[in-house]
């Protein structure tokens, strides 16, 4: 944890949330082995509100913080491991994290399987429990492993992890949702498949132009300069800055802008990017244009990183870590960057010999910010595969109501038909 105050995930303007009829119906029993089995009435994360009984066992604490507690558990019906995030619910408001997670369905975002409410030890205390995909590792722990061994993370993994992060950001930004806490600890990893999933939407918010937002958001080291300047009208490009900090950290083996305070972090940023111009300051926060900064020249990006760092990685970093928010690449543009060209090679494999995870199954929703980029993002071999798997009219009709999942190959199929 960064030690920063946790921002609320309760929507400020929502009406009081109604206590669910299934609230509190939690049963505890024992299975034939004597293990404790908890059965709750839970609502599926996606789809209609149809509460159902869900049983889980082997519960243990795997994390906690100012937000609450995270448990690992095993679903009794499937044997799958899940993570259960338990947070105190203010009964006056809907929980913003829940509202956002119910909208999301993407291969690079941790899935909300179910949610349920439970009572606390104190009277009238209500907890919201989010039942999520369990993913065993994080980018933070993997990067720390290499750093402690005095090694750098293999570049192929840097490409895989960052590409999938940008895909997840392109998806949530297409809904106007800003994560506001991108950092290595919130990037879950399956070490065998190299699949990355973005997690922890406790700080996420749907940003509306003209509506103010709190500036004390995002964990230290990853805060965009406009946040340090106290801006309240920022955009989802703060996530892009944070992602740029993650990329730089994976290349360097340590945070690029460390600092225990906003001033310390700003000093570190100025050491690399140089003193911001008056115009750049105006773009970040107009209230600071008269502030006097020491005049420091930008440090060449090639000297920031190790000599063997791929030039494309440095070039991408320089396009993400820009003072002016509108000058930063969008997540979709970042995915199309030449740094990721190796991933578009049909012969690329993981170092363990496995195939790379799904990288080109873009939805029309994901591509909505810049549809023409599909020609770069979906390589020819992926278009051919998508065309071969395009459903017949009958199948397509039966799939018409499957929502975002049903659109999975639409973009690739359209691209394939246009290229043949």
Swiss-Prot record:
The active site is at residue 181. The keyword Lipoprotein applies. One of its GO terms (molecular function) is kinase activity. The modification Phosphothreonine is found at residues 390, 402. It holds the Pfam family Pkinase. A lipid is attached at residue 14 (S-palmitoyl cysteine). GO terms for cellular component: axon; beta-catenin destruction complex; centrosome; cytoplasm; cytosol; dendrite; glutamatergic synapse; mitochondrion. Residues 1-22 have a biased composition (Polar residues). It is found in: Cytoplasm; Nucleus; Cell membrane. Expressed in testis, thymus, prostate and ovary and weakly expressed in lung, brain and kidney. Colocalizes with EIF2AK2/PKR and TAU in the Alzheimer disease (AD) brain. The modification Phosphoserine is found at residues 9, 389. Residues 56-340 form the Protein kinase domain. ATP binds at residues 62-70, 85. SMART domains: S_TKc. Keywords: ADP-ribosylation, Alzheimer disease, ATP-binding, Biological rhythms, Carbohydrate metabolism, Cell membrane, Cytoplasm, Developmental protein, Diabetes mellitus, Differentiation, Glycogen metabolism, Kinase, Lipoprotein, Membrane, Neurogenesis, Nucleotide-binding, Nucleus, Palmitate, Phosphoprotein, Serine/threonine-protein kinase, Signal transduction inhibitor, Transferase, Wnt signaling pathway. Changing residue 128 to A: Abolishes activity toward AXIN1. It catalyses: L-seryl-[tau protein] + ATP = O-phospho-L-seryl-[tau protein] + ADP + H(+); L-threonyl-[tau protein] + ATP = O-phospho-L-threonyl-[tau protein] + ADP + H(+); L-seryl-[protein] + ATP = O-phospho-L-seryl-[protein] + ADP + H(+); L-threonyl-[protein] + ATP = O-phospho-L-threonyl-[protein] + ADP + H(+). Its EC number is 2.7.11.26, 2.7.11.1. Residues 386-401, 409-420 have a biased composition (Low complexity). Monomer. Interacts with ARRB2, DISC1 and ZBED3. Interacts with CABYR, MMP2, MUC1, NIN and PRUNE1. Interacts with AXIN1; the interaction mediates hyperphosphorylation of CTNNB1 leading to its ubiquitination and destruction. Interacts with and phosphorylates SNAI1. Interacts with DNM1L (via a C-terminal domain). Found in a complex composed of MACF1, APC, AXIN1, CTNNB1 and GSK3B. Interacts with SGK3. Interacts with DAB2IP (via C2 domain); the interaction stimulates GSK3B kinase activation. Interacts (via C2 domain) with PPP2CA. Interacts with the CLOCK-BMAL1 heterodimer. Belongs to the protein kinase superfamily. CMGC Ser/Thr protein kinase family. GSK-3 subfamily. Higher expression and activity of GSK3B are found in the skeletal muscle (vastus lateralis) of patients with type 2 diabetes. Several potent GSK3 (GSK3A and GSK3B) inhibitors have been identified and characterized in preclinical models for treatments of type 2 diabetes. This is Glycogen synthase kinase-3 beta. It comes from Homo sapiens.
């Amino acid at each position: 944890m960064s030690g920063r105050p946790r921002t609320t995930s309760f929507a400020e303007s929502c009406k009081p949330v109604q206590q669910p009829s299934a609230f509190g119906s939690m049963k505890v029993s024992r299975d034939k082995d004597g293990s404790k089995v908890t059965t709750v009435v839970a609502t599926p994360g996606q789809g209609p509100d149809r509460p159902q009984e869900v049983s889980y066992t082997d519960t243990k604490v795997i994390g906690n913080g100012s937000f609450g507690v995270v448990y690992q558990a095993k679903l009794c019906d499937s044997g799958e491991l899940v993570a259960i995030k338990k947070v105190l619910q203010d009964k006056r408001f809907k929980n913003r994290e829940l509202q956002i997670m119910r909208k999301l369905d993407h291969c690079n975002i941790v899935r909300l399987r179910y949610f349920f409410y439970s009572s606390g030890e104190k009277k009238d205390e209500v907890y919201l429990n989010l039942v999520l995909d369990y993913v065993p590792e994080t980018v933070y722990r993997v990067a720390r492993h290499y750093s402690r061994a005095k090694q750098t993370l293999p570049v192929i993994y840097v490409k895989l992890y960052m590409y999938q992060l940008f895909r997840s950001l392109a998806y949530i930004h297409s809904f106007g949702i800003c994560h506001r806490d991108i950092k290595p600890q919130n990037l879950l990893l399956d070490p065998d498949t190299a699949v990355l999933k973005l997690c922890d939407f406790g700080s996420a918010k749907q940003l509306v132009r003209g509506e103010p937002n709190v500036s004390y958001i995002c964990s230290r080291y990853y805060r965009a300069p406009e946040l340090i300047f106290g801006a309240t009208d920022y955009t989802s490009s703060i996530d892009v800055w944070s992602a740029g900090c993650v990329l730089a950290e994976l290349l360097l083996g340590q945070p690029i802008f460390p600092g225990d305070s906003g001033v310390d972090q700003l000093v570190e940023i100025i050491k690399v990017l140089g003193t911001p111009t008056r115009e750049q300051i105006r773009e970040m926060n107009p209230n600071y244009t008269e502030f006097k900064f020491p005049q420091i020249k930008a440090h060449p990006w090639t000297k920031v990183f190790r000599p063997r760092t791929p030039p494309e990685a440095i070039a991408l970093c320089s396009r993400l870590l820009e003072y002016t928010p509108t000058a930063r690449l969008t997540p979709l543009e970042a995915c199309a960057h030449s740094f990721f060209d190796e991933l578009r090679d049909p012969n690329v494999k993981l170092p363990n010999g496995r195939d790379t995870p799904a990288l080109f199954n873009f939805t029309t929703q994901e591509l909505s910010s810049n549809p023409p980029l599909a020609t770069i993002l979906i390589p020819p071999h992926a278009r051919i595969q998508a065309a071969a798997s395009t459903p017949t009219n009958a199948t397509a009709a039966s799939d018409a109501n499957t929502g975002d999942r049903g659109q999975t190959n639409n973009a690739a199929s359209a691209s394939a038909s246009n290229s043949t």
